[in-house]
């Protein structure tokens, strides 16, 4: 995997092929379809990068808006052993970079049933709080944050 620029074509490709867990999350939190959610996220971000898989296909986009870090992806994001390894290694470097750039704690909300994301967030050093109602649907989400 490698970092690439989040062009319009990349945004469309990831938005139209978003993994189910991320689609559910953006619908419950903001009542948005995947393409609209990822487009708005990219446009509002202060820092933004896209992720290309080993096969050259975009598999995700991540960014930070104010102090809110986010990642939306396709099933390709974790489809191979190589992708999973890079996501863990590069993910930690990305979060460290974002913390340095923002200069304040960063965090966001994750749907409580999105167990893979919660496990990954903890691996990246985030504190994940207990579920509470959040967003458009009032579904249970866990706030997560990291200060250093």
Predicted features along the sequence, with ranges:
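A structural microfeature
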Residues: 60, 130-133
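Conserved acyl-CoA
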Residues: 89-106, 126
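Short amphipathic alpha-helix that is part of the acyltransferase structural core
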Residues: 1-32
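A short helix-loop-beta-strand connector motif used in the catalytic cores of GNAT acetyltransferases and
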Residues: 38-53, 57, 139
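Conserved beta-strand in the GNAT
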Residues: 50, 55-70
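Conserved acetyl-CoA binding element of GNAT-fold acetyltransferases
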Residues: 65-86, 142
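C-terminal "cap" of GNAT-fold acetyltransferases
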Residues: 134-148
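Conserved beta-strand-loop-alpha-helix junction that forms the acyl-donor binding cleft
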Residues: 102-122, 134-137
